[in-house]
Amino acid sequence: LAYPLGGHFHIPHGLSNALVLPHVLGFNASVAAPLYAELAPLVLGEQLRAGGVLQQTEQFIGALADFSVRSGLPTRLRDAGVPQDMLPTLARDAMQQQRLLVNNPREMTEAHALAIYQVAY
């Protein structure tokens, strides 16, 4: 979902990924939580609180979102200059990136992409 942000608004690729990453991870959590929980100790270290897979997944996603905040990066699409009326166009264009979407652990439709952009807005 990062590519259309760069294509339309010239947002640097790393920033465009940071803007959508927590939301994409949240979307994928229903199928990828065990993988995210496995990564949680590597990201959080001693800050990881005890809990099951879902709790560790939430902590992992939260830690990645917090990294953007602590880095001073914009954390919402609106903060990066994306107009709200462009979200449907971004979702449509994101569906053109099939070489990337096929690697996503959960099938993503245009409606899913739009919902993610709306949450990220």
Feature annotation, model-predicted:
Residues 83-121:
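Short, amphipathic C-terminal "tail helix"
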Residues 5-86:
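Gly/Pro-rich interdomain helix-loop hinge
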Residues 2, 21, 64, 68, ...:
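Short alpha-helical scaffolding segments that buttress acidic/His motifs in well-ordered protein cores
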Residues 1, 10-11, 97:
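Generic hydrophobic alpha-helical membrane-segment signal
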